[in-house]
UniProtKB/Swiss-Prot annotation:
<dbReference type="GO" id="GO:0006168">
    <property type="term" value="P:adenine salvage"/>
</dbReference>
<dbReference type="InterPro" id="IPR029057">
    <property type="entry name" value="PRTase-like"/>
</dbReference>
<comment type="function">
    <text>Catalyzes a salvage reaction resulting in the formation of AMP, that is energically less costly than de novo synthesis.</text>
</comment>
<keyword id="KW-0660">Purine salvage</keyword>
<dbReference type="GO" id="GO:0005737">
    <property type="term" value="C:cytoplasm"/>
</dbReference>
<keyword id="KW-0328">Glycosyltransferase</keyword>
<keyword id="KW-0808">Transferase</keyword>
<dbReference type="GO" id="GO:0016208">
    <property type="term" value="F:AMP binding"/>
</dbReference>
<dbReference type="GO" id="GO:0003999">
    <property type="term" value="F:adenine phosphoribosyltransferase activity"/>
</dbReference>
<comment type="similarity">
    <text>Belongs to the purine/pyrimidine phosphoribosyltransferase family.</text>
</comment>
<dbReference type="GO" id="GO:0044209">
    <property type="term" value="P:AMP salvage"/>
</dbReference>
<protein>
    <recommendedName>
        <fullName>Adenine phosphoribosyltransferase</fullName>
        <ecNumber>2.4.2.7</ecNumber>
    </recommendedName>
</protein>
<comment type="subunit">
    <text>Homodimer.</text>
</comment>
<dbReference type="InterPro" id="IPR000836">
    <property type="entry name" value="PRibTrfase_dom"/>
</dbReference>
<keyword id="KW-0963">Cytoplasm</keyword>
<dbReference type="GO" id="GO:0006166">
    <property type="term" value="P:purine ribonucleoside salvage"/>
</dbReference>
<dbReference type="InterPro" id="IPR005764">
    <property type="entry name" value="Ade_phspho_trans"/>
</dbReference>
């Protein structure tokens, strides 16, 4: 399956900024059989099985997190960029490979569950995932691990995290 996935991921040089090699995973969802195979694989992870809930990261993480949530019968909450969520929020700023941003989680969503699997499309520097884990931990929650479709190994994001990382493809 790995070779099939690699063929479906397109690289865009100098996007969104000069010097960045953007890996576009959206080709995967255009191939339902491969997408399903990927979701079945990710859903069977011990990290997913042991977590009470899934937290997906804005925006492409929602695609994979939603599908995994359905397949694994796990609730899903979202970590969103500024101005996208109503209500009382838990917020944190983070650094990206190409800038700075912040993420928010609705506090009421965090009340029901104590252990989480983080799902995103890609792991680069680890800044986004680290932000989500710190948000969860600051609310007394446990992060069991991270599942991503793509991991950019040269950026060493996994080494900044204190929990297991499972990636379907590495570049």
């Amino acid at each position: 399956m790995e070779n099939k996935l690699i063929e479906l991921i397109e690289t865009y040089n100098d996007f969104p900024r000069k010097g960045i090699e953007f890996k576009d995973v959206l080709g995967i969802i255009q191939e339902p059989k491969i997408f399903k195979e990927l979701i079945l694989k990710m859903s069977s992870s011990q990290i997913i099985r042991n977590a009470e809930a899934i937290i997906s990261i804005d925006a492409r993480g929602f695609i994979f997190g939603s599908a995994i949530s359905l397949e694994a019968s796990k609730p899903m909450i979202v970590a969103r960029k500024p101005g996208k969520l109503p209500g009382e929020l838990s917020k944190k700023k983070y650094s990206l490979e190409y800038g700075e941003n912040s993420l928010s989680i609705q506090k009421k969503c965090l009340q029901k569950y104590n252990s989480y699997a983080i799902v995103d499309d890609l792991l680069a520097t680890g800044g986004t995932v680290s932000c989500v884990s710190k948000l969860l931990e600051s609310n007394g929650k446990e992060v069991l691990g991270l599942l991503v479709v793509v991991e950019l190994m040269k950026l060493k994001g996994r080494f900044k995290l204190k929990f297991p990382v499972e990636s379907s493809i590495t570049f």
